[in-house]
Amino acid sequence: RYGADVINRIIEQGKPGGVKRLQDAILKETLRPMVGLMCKTAGITADRIFRVAIASNTTMNHLLLGVDANPVRMEPYIPTFFQWRGLVAKDLSFAANPDAEVLISPNIGSYVGGDITAGALTSLIWDKDEFSLFIDLGTNGELVFGNRDFMMSCACSAGPAFEGGDISCGMRATDGAVEAVVIDKDTMEPTLSIVGDAGQKPVGICGSGIIDVIAELYRTSIISAKGQFVREGKRVAHDEHGMGRYILATKDESETGREISITEVDIDSFIRAKAAIFSAINIMLSSLDMDVTVLEHVYVAGGIGSGINMENAVRIGMFPDVDRSLFEYIGNSSLAGAYAMARSDNAVDKVDELASNMTYMELSTNPRYMDEFVAACFLPHTNRELFPSSVQE
């Protein structure tokens, strides 16, 4: 209702009465029913909740607390607050015991918020000697790099494609979502893995499935490095304007009676999203006079599906071409971090410590970022030497 991205929500809260309107949308219209459902499932009443832990992005932290979020999107891109302690449920009319402690995971910068500090907590980057990279895939792609000695963070505007947004048949990773794809190189026929019970027909395609289908289309030479269709077959169709698409499921094969396909426009949107991630990784590492060869762990988080085919993510140039054993998909890390904070004072102290010690890099003011981004808007990249395994294929 108020936009799928934080910028639209900030604009909305800037209108007369907007701050209160969005705060009510979060607390009363969203969280209160969720808490009610959780209490019903657990067989308890809300007054038995004595601690609440929240891990959300910087903008949502501001909107939740009824604080002006405009500084998030305006130069010099400094949030109104970074850390807020001492809250209790009655301060927010939160659906819990009035004296329940409300813990907000702290912000690092305008686009690296409490969801990332909570995620960094669970990744254990801070407890390792080795250099690790933490990547959270969402509308903003957030990165944390470092080890027990230091940590640096940044964010890039990847858009909603990783979560199925701005994709013609995209959806979140719920029942009916195509989450994995393999394409036969000769017949061009797809084999689909679908979220849900056995026999579930496809409804749409989620982030992990989009990664797979683009990687497979490229591997089988159905699309070019620019994401354009260059092979013909019964699974490839074109509209009246000549725009190509690959048909994953015909009307008869889908749950909804609607064709499920991925178009050249979809592919272009996703290429831009993956380019944002890869270029951010390059900029962050190069700012430290390092490159991807120093990486010993790569943790990937986000609601993109039950898992990511890391080989395919590298094939399209989304992640660096390093040993695949370094990658680990850790799922919803911000939720895991909030859970840890709810259960442990030590976790609360640690997440505050991480936030205080983490350096934030603002990519939007980096003069090299756009050049790196444009170079990454190909499959896998304009510099093929960065992807030796793709060259070997």
Describe the predicted segments one by one.
Residues 1-5, 71-84, 118, 124-209, ...:
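Glycine-rich phosphate-binding loop of actin/hexokinase-like ATP-binding domains
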Residues 101-116, 340-393:
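Acidic, glycine/GT-rich loop-and beta-edge segments that sit at the periphery of enzyme/chaperone cores
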Residues 1-63, 71-73, 103:
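N-terminal glycine/serine-rich phosphate-binding loop of ATP-dependent small-molecule kinases
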Residues 29-42, 116-119, 271-293:
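Phosphate/ATP-binding catalytic cores across multiple sugar-kinase/actin-like superfamilies
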Residues 3, 9, 63-118, 162-166:
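Glycine-rich phosphate-binding loop and adjoining helix at the ATP-binding site
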Residues 147-152, 156, 290-354:
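Catalytic phosphate/nucleotide-handling subdomain of diverse soluble enzymes
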Residues 218-288:
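A contiguous, well-structured pocket-lining segment that forms one wall/lid of small-molecule binding clefts
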Residues 57-71, 242, 290-293, 302-321, ...:
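Short glycine/threonine-rich loop-to-helix capping motif typified by GTGT followed
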